[in-house]
């Protein structure tokens, strides 16, 4: 009596098995069902199981209970699908071993013959169905996998242009943990050389822009010297969100620097020690790279307002530093927006001796005089230099044919082939390891020579509390340099009577770090270690944080914050 039976538990009706056992109705088996079974152990009934099908078919109450068929036969120990045309869905047996040891299959000897079954071949074979379903499922898995990979690849492609893409952070952590510092650095430059780096498309805040004389910075953040020594990927680095970059330090002749390994990182303290020693390709080749950048800058609107400075120094075996500096200025001076004199690197023997007041005064005056001569003598109209410059550019980009208009524009702008179309400013980079008397003497020299600005500071050699840097020589930069640099900025800001602009460098990792430097007296900031430890998102994040802090502390613009620490005290 069907009404007395629980609708969930029914046996398979024989007549319906016969009616659906045809090969041409395979599509009808895409129906759903629940399967339950319980093993019935008996001495006389080995290898038999009681199959219970949970049926939700709307026709179940119309079936005669006398036609229910329970003839099952145990065939093998493989897990299979069990199909029923009476059910509305299908399900794979998850743990068949707890119910039956083998799957169910129709026993044709119990079915007998009928109009619907002519021979054994006409009976639907469960093994055949299982194999087909397995193939279909594998195809579906492949399609789903390919669809997932395609969607993720499409997402990654568009997000790869975002400096804050999360995969960059994962890759950065891997590099910091397993790859040598200089190899990581070279890999970054290689990506930048072929324009594979992301770029910042956000608009810089008008309240965070600043200037140093005729240098207008669209935001106060740039890249310090030493990151792109040879100017191979200036545009790619600037597009990360920086307003300026300082290439170099360059020397008249190329040199390999000190022995490797020479760059070591301490992730825990976010500090770097390096003993590179002015490794660069030489002034001539760097000049070629800078000329090519200036060409791209004229064609790319994203780069039209970005500043490029050049740090210059002396070769390791040079006795008179002034000769090397003059050579570099004559070669690259007309393409630079500012010239930074590096007399403070700890990795070139005897270089820091040039910070002595008398020597420093002579160096600054010689450099300023040489820059003035570039304008007075009209060097770009000198035939020999003009031809020489054309030969340099011809090596890479057929300069004479395609860029004649560029040369004409340069002549119309006093031959300064740079962003400002004016002669470059002169900055000097100082070491933090100076006593108070030396700092005061240097401040007097800077005021006397009317220098355009000072970069504070270079790396320090007076940090010895980092365990991983024990027995390693070189200059330390990063978070350990932050407080030393900030204190140095405060002192020089007061010693120069707030008259000489300051470019802050050393230990800047966040907007708060940058604002501390600015309130101490800095006009703009340079980043290096931040790029190493924070990656490509450095500029985007630090600009956002600084804008928020300026608003939070009630500054109308960044210029109001410069030196505010001194007015508060």
UniProtKB/Swiss-Prot annotation:
Cofactor note: Binds 1 FMN per subunit.
Transmembrane segments: 143-163
Binding site for substrate: 229, 274-278, 342, 347, 458-459
Listed pathway(s): Pyrimidine metabolism; UMP biosynthesis via de novo pathway; orotate from (S)-dihydroorotate (quinone route): step 1/1
EC number of the protein: 1.3.5.2
Subcellular location: Mitochondrion inner membrane
UniProt binding sites for FMN: 225-229, 249, 342, 429, 477-478, 505-507, 528-529
Pfam families: DHO_dh
Annotated organelle transit peptide span: 1-23
Main subcellular location of this protein, as a coarse class: mitochondrion
Superkingdom of the organism of origin: Eukaryota
Membrane topology designation: Single-pass membrane protein
Subunit structure: Monomer.
Membership in a protein family: Belongs to the dihydroorotate dehydrogenase family. Type 2 subfamily.
Protein's name according to its UniProt entry: Dihydroorotate dehydrogenase (quinone), mitochondrial
